[in-house]
């Protein structure tokens, strides 16, 4: 039986909140089978839980939020959610003493390291996957995203940014998903933004944690970070990272082929909701052994060590 995963032990880290610029303590806790992914704000009394759920997602100018029925929110969940998807973590409680997850370096890599440091444990309960049975597509003007049936998980993402720092050959990225591929090719890609936008937001008391330490910053002509880019095509790789996190908001790894053109958090979420709303378009599946499991989801030794 392919089993659900959680952490072996509690781990903690600190970072800066993108919105407030204040120190945030992040605690990751193991959770029993069928708990799912739970985000928890401990700065509120009593603490408030936000289960990962496609219908709770709100896209803001700066990040992805989860919002409950009382309009209480937790922000900047997307990069940690991508790390959970990358390592196939089914059950976890994520605590922060703030209204947001720390931005760290603007990628998912610090969260991957934290999860691997905690160790990954298998629970004696079958892991559920969402398998795509029918093609589902959503559009917004010239932007679109779709899922097609496929026995694995592939992603093909195209951006269309007209900027001297972004070469035309660096606007598309495609990959066969696996934990190894995610960690090596995607997890280190950072979020990006224009210096003028960051300065404008900070003048209004927003994005106070935004800096060269947590994003690729560009002006009209070039990348301003002293160290430059981590990959020639880091921009599109980060958009794929975002998509992996957005699509894991259902709390399950997805078996299917994802293709997108100029998509963002809102359209990725719209696609996920469109799939889940169409009963005949998907099904839950479990697997008895590795022989049945799509190659995309076979755990490398680095994960289940």
UniProtKB/Swiss-Prot annotation:
Keywords: Hydrolase, Lipid A biosynthesis, Lipid biosynthesis, Lipid metabolism, Metal-binding, Zinc
Annotated Gene3D superfamilies: lpxc deacetylase, domain 1, lpxc deacetylase, domain 2
SUPFAM superfamilies for this protein: Ribosomal protein S5 domain 2-like
Intrachain S-S bonds: none
Main enzyme class: hydrolase
Enzyme Commission number, as recorded: 3.5.1.108
Residues annotated to bind Zn(2+): 79, 238, 242
The reaction(s) this protein catalyses: a UDP-3-O-[(3R)-3-hydroxyacyl]-N-acetyl-alpha-D-glucosamine + H2O = a UDP-3-O-[(3R)-3-hydroxyacyl]-alpha-D-glucosamine + acetate
GO cellular component terms attached to this protein's record: membrane
Transmembrane intervals: none
Cofactor requirement: Zn(2+)
Pathway: Glycolipid biosynthesis; lipid IV(A) biosynthesis; lipid IV(A) from (3R)-3-hydroxytetradecanoyl-[acyl-carrier-protein] and UDP-N-acetyl-alpha-D-glucosamine: step 2/6
Active site: 265
GO terms for MF: metal ion binding; UDP-3-O-acyl-N-acetylglucosamine deacetylase activity
GO BP: lipid A biosynthetic process
Function text: Catalyzes the hydrolysis of UDP-3-O-myristoyl-N-acetylglucosamine to form UDP-3-O-myristoylglucosamine and acetate, the committed step in lipid A biosynthesis.
Family, as annotated: Belongs to the LpxC family.
Protein name in UniProt: UDP-3-O-acyl-N-acetylglucosamine deacetylase
Species whose genome carries this gene: Salmonella paratyphi A (strain AKU_12601)
């Amino acid at each position: 039986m392919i089993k659900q995963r959680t952490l072996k032990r509690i781990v903690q880290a600190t970072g800066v909140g993108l919105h407030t610029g204040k120190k945030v303590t992040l605690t990751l806790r193991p959770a029993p089978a069928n708990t799912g992914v739970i985000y928890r704000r401990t700065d509120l009394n009593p603490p408030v839980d936000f289960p990962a759920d496609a219908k709770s997602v709100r896209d803001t100018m700066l990040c992805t939020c989860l919002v409950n029925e009382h309009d209480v929110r937790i922000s900047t969940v997307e990069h940690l959610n991508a790390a959970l998807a990358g390592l196939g973590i089914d059950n976890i409680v994520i605590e922060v003493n703030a209204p947001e997850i720390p931005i760290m370096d603007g990628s998912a890599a610090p969260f991957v390291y934290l999860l691997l440091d905690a160790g990954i444990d298998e629970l004696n309960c079958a892991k559920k996957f969402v398998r795509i049975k029918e093609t589902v597509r959503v559009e917004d003007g010239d932007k679109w995203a779709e899922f097609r049936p496929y026995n694995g998980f592939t992603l093909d993402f195209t951006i269309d940014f007209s900027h001297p720092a972004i070469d035309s050959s660096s606007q598309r990225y495609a990959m066969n998903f696996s934990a190894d591929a995610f960690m090596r090719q995607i997890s280190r890609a950072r979020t990006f933004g224009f210096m003028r936008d960051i300065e404008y937001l900070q003048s209004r008391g927003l994005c106070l944690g935004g800096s060269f330490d947590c994003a690729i910053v560009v002006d009209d002509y070039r990348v301003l970070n002293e160290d430059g880019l981590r990959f020639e095509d880091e921009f599109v790789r980060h958009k794929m990272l975002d998509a992996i996190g957005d699509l894991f908001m259902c709390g399950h790894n997805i078996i299917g082929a994802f293709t997108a053109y100029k998509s963002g958090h809102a359209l990725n979420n719209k696609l996920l909701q469109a799939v889940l709303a169409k009963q005949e378009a998907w099904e839950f599946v479990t697997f008895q052994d590795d022989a049945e499991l799509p190659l995309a989801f076979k755990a490398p030794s680095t994960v289940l060590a």
